[in-house]
Structures are given as structure tokens and as C-alpha cells.
């Protein structure tokens, strides 16, 4: 992560130095006031690619140093809100307000097709079994260390004592909104400029993955980030990615909460979910079906209306 941050920072600095009108005045020295004036004067509808990268670096650096200042006595509610709102959402919102001409467009808050919204809801449910399998496969390849496992167990014990609606609000809905506005909103929109579709999808996914402290979570989040990036590109905004992200997190938390509280699988869900030693999991046949359904639903996202097509083409200009 440190190496990536350095590379991104160097690339951003090179971009700035390439613009002589920005970095130098008559005396040939760099002037902070002149540079800030340039950023304000030359604002675009969406962020410049270098500004989007800078935002991602700021989020990673903030997440890294925050762990040294958070009190061990702080509640998980307080920590979650501070991280999501203060370290992830706030930087991209402030940069959108100060460095772009349209914060709404910079955050990619656009009207969404009804067919895309419907597909996003169904994808959220259909994709989750495959995501669960991916997580188990990653853990089997890269086992979680004993110290990390102990920390996770302590965290889960603290979290799952709460009411389910509190957990869903703080760990499903809030991260979905904040993280999507940041990574598939401001950062993705800036990287998408100049026909940078592949750049936007991959870089935003990696930055999204690196915000997760545990290696196994980071890998699975990066893979999910690639899919969310594809959805963000095809739908022309963040609304559908927020839906998929929220449903995916919500299902994981609900299944874990029910298992921790020793709840039996409802009869209506026995055809898809089973309860075992490791908690609730999907039946093998449903895991296969979910892959087929997810592929079919993703095809719906490739059907754009003219309005959505115009929005995406304008972002890529």
C-alpha cells in the first residue's frame, strides 16, 4: 500500500510539474497561491485524473494514520462513523465542491434507468453466494493468522451483541453510501476521463481493496470492486453500485448475526441456505445457479438508454 501511494503521489506531482503555467511564475519558482488559483480557475465538471488519484491517496493515508489515534475505549459505532464519514466521504465531497464545477456530477449522482435499478437489486442477491465462495477460497489459500483471528473474534463479539438493524445501518448502508460515492463516484469519475474506462475500473477497485485492513478482505474487496466498477460504468452513476454493495454487506452481516445468535434457518430459505459448524452458508446447487443468474443480469446492464449513453460519453470526454 505504501509503495502504491508513493507511485501515485509521484505520478500526480509529475503531472503538475509538466504544466509550466501552473507551477512557475516569472521568477521560475513554484508558488502555492498561483497553483491553488489554477486549480480553482480551471475546474472541470468532473475531477481531473490526477486529482482523483490524490483523493484516493489521501483516503489511504488517512486510514493508515487513524489507527494510531483511535482510542481503544471508543465504541465501534463512533469509530465506524468517523472512518466512513470523516476519512472516506469527507475528502471526496470537499474536493468535489472545491475542485469541480458540479459536485453532483463529480460524485456521479445521476438519474438511473429503472431496468438498471431492478437488475442491481437482483444482482445484489444473486452475486452474494459467489462472493461467499470467493471469501472462503481466499482464506484457504491465505489462512488468517492467529492474532488477526483473535482480533476478528473480539470485534464480532462486540458487533453482534447489537440489534440487527443497528448493524445493518452502520456496517451495510453507511459504508455502501460513503465508499461508493468516493470510489465509484469521485475517484471513478475522474479516472474515467480521456477514455480511461479500464484505468477507472482497475485503479478504483485496488484503492477500494486497500482500504480494508485485513489481507483476505482486501483481496475479496478488490475483486468485488472490479464488478462494482463495471456496474458503475455501464449504469452511468453510483446509485446501482450502492444498491449492490449494500445488499452484499447486508446479507453477509445478517447470516453471520443469525448464526452467532444460534437462530435456525427459516423453512422458507431451506432450499438455498443451510446451517453448519461455520455458520449459515449457501447450498452448492444455489451457488452454481447464482453464477448463471449474475451473468444474465449483468447483460441487462449493457442495455443503455440514450440518456445514460449521453451521460457516460460526456464523462469519458
Predicted regions and their residues:
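Membrane-interface helix/loop boundary segments of multi-pass membrane proteins
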Residues: 178-203, 230-237
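Juxtamembrane helix-loop-helix connectors linking adjacent transmembrane helices
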Residues: 73-80, 104-178, 193
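Hydrophobic alpha-helical transmembrane segments
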Residues: 1-3, 156-176, 276-296
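Hydrophobic core of alpha-helical transmembrane segments in multi-pass integral membrane proteins
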Residues: 3-11, 53-65, 88-94, 124-127, ...
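C-terminal membrane module of polytopic membrane proteins
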Residues: 246-317
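Interfacial transmembrane-helix boundary/kink motif in multi-pass membrane proteins
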Residues: 29-56, 103-133, 282-292, 315-317
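Junction motif at the cytosolic side of a transmembrane helix
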Residues: 5-46, 300-317
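Membrane-helix interface linkers and caps
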Residues: 76-122, 140-143, 298-316
